[in-house]
Amino acid sequence: MKKLFVLFALMVIAFTSYAQVYKMYKTRNYHNQLRLNTMTGEVQQIQDDGQSWEICSAREILGDKEGRFRLYETQNMWTFIMLDTYTGKNWQVQFSVKGEDYMFAAPINIFSLAYPEKSSNWTNRFQMFATDNMWTFILLDSYNGRLWQVQYSTQDLDNLFCICLLYTS
């Protein structure tokens, strides 16, 4: 009986650890969800029949903090913005039902806006907020108040950008 209890306790711990690392995001296409590894930034499209595709490979191979990456839904039903809440890097993530040729993760900002140390606990340092313009988000550094405009596009990936709006020292 004691062994059974220990086994059950280990299973609960393993299940809760898994639940914290992976987060499911509903999409407006009810047959599909996105699964985000919040430690590494890997994104998979999961279809309700069990099929899955990798949209975005791991962005942080040595990811050791749960909740580091987050997806933000846009007004375009096929597009999310992925944010590294430690560094401010962000990507446009697009899923599709037309096939893998239409699934991608394109970098919007590949440069770190902050440089955390190994001991830093910077989860949620950076946050994004939607604006009235469907193509634009505001990126906030909650530690110092700096702001950036983040723009995505479904037509031309050359129109992706992240520009500083407010810089405080």
Where are these regions (language model features)?
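Structural signature of eukaryotic scaffold interfaces centered on beta-propeller domains
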Residues: 72-74, 129
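Short beta-strand motif characteristic of blades in beta-propeller domains
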Residues: 32-38, 79-85, 135-142
